[in-house]
Amino acid sequence: MAIFRQLSLGAKATLAAVTVFVSMIASRSYLAESLELRAWRWLLRLQLALFVNSLLLIGSLYIWRSTVSNLCHSPAAESTCFQLWKVVVLAFLALAHSSFFTMFFLVAEEPYLFSLAAYSCLGAYIIMLFFLFILSGMEQAYQLLAWRSGRVVGSLEKTRKLVLRPALAVGVTAVLSVAGILNAAQPPAVKTVEVPIHQLPASMNNLKIVLLSDIHLGPTVGRTKMEMFVRMVNVLEPDITVIVGDLSDSEASVLRTAVAPLGQLHSHLGAYFVTGNHEYYTSDVSNWFALLESLHVQPLHNENVKISATRAQRGGGGSGSGSEDEDWICLAGVDDIEADILHYSGHGMDLDKALEGCSPDHTIILLAHQPLAAKRALQARPDINLILSGHTHAGQIFPLNVAAYLLNPFFAGLYQVAQATFVYVSPGTAYYGIPMRLGSRAEITELILQRSP
């Protein structure tokens, strides 16, 4: 205990983050199947909120030191403006820290203003932290060069730099945050992509699939946006509409009215859904499946449908039989790989089950939320013609774009993996939490499948 008291606040925050992370791993391994579902849901969310806030506290201490503490010895430290500045910074950090807790209490048909403000501050927090690090690194490099050249940096110059660094970081953060909010507020771009498909039946040439992903209904995305997405999809007149995961961030009962516009989708050959990692974070997948089915959106729970030019028929994965029509494609969907990590009962990526009855002599299209799942699927079944994924958001905001690019085998857009194999990763139709898009653009993808010899 004495050693803990001697630790700095930053070290204590780091220790807290490690402790919460270990508890998350332990609870996933030992409590996932023994706890009642509602209790498990609350435990998982509470652990996530505490873990994120422990990490945020480390950054908050750095932001406070850079923008407030380092300026306390400046001539303006006793001014009313500086006292007001301290209140503004404190409120900004408090809002950023409260963002993840809005998942508990502030989810409804439409976003609450507080949730939008809190998540906007979280986005600005990430941008500011990045630029403070960059400017600090530049300052350290300058001081090193000055020392090596024998130049002495005066106290007045040091004071100016202490003021200049946070001023620049705040200015850049403000500009980029406003740009990101305005970008995210725009309707998603409609991107048309033509994909050559080997063995595509002649009767299904120019088949149109509209791809949605990562809508994230929850604290900052509600019914109004969902209605807009549905209208945009219907204008495209798709043959098939697919939603490749992360539709929601809360329970089905809470978001029932927000997701209701999906029932107005018009797709000649049906609308289909596969889970993303966030569906499992809600711990309410069964209720989401039932709700989507009532809206005429068919979940593909490690199963497939055989689709011809005129009809769709449930295929393998435990139900139904094959289509009698020879001119068909196999549209399969797998559970998100996060279900295995969370030990979510009855769920987990099962490619063999999903592709049961899908002949290599026919076109195979797979829905798999994460690009990592797409990579694993292609390693096991290289005969898959097209995989549709999401998850990355194309990074959503700078500088997270860099991390998303490095952590995923496929980042965004169309990839030709082999002569007859393609992967398309959607950058997302909305956004997760933070109502910003910086260095990325939300998208509704119109995929035109073209017959290839």
Curated annotation (Swiss-Prot):
Membrane spanning stretches: 7-27, 43-63, 87-107, 114-134, 162-182
Binding site for a divalent metal cation 1: D214, H216, D246, H393
Family under the similarity heading: Belongs to the metallophosphoesterase superfamily. LOC643853 family.
Xref: Gene3D superfamilies: 3.60.21.10
Family matches, as PANTHER family: TRANSMEMBRANE PROTEIN WITH METALLOPHOSPHOESTERASE DOMAIN, TRANSMEMBRANE PROTEIN WITH METALLOPHOSPHOESTERASE DOMAIN-RELATED
UniProt cross-references to InterPro entries, sorted A to Z: Calcineurin-like_PHP_ApaH, Metallo-depent_PP-like, Metallophosphoesterase_sf
Cofactor: binding details: Binds 2 divalent metal cations.
EC class name: hydrolase
Recorded topology in the membrane: Multi-pass membrane protein
UniProt keyword terms in alphabetical order: Hydrolase, Membrane, Metal-binding, Transmembrane, Transmembrane helix
Molecular-function annotations in GO: hydrolase activity; metal ion binding
Keyword Membrane on entry: yes
Entry annotated with the keyword Metal-binding: yes
UniProt xrefs under SUPFAM superfamilies: Metallo-dependent phosphatases
Residues binding a divalent metal cation 2, per UniProt: D246, N277, H391
Record's subcellular location: Membrane
Enzyme Commission number(s) of this protein: 3.1.-.-
Gene Ontology CC annotations of this record: membrane
Protein name, UniProt field: Transmembrane protein with metallophosphoesterase domain
Origin: domain of life: Eukaryota
Pfam families: Metallophos
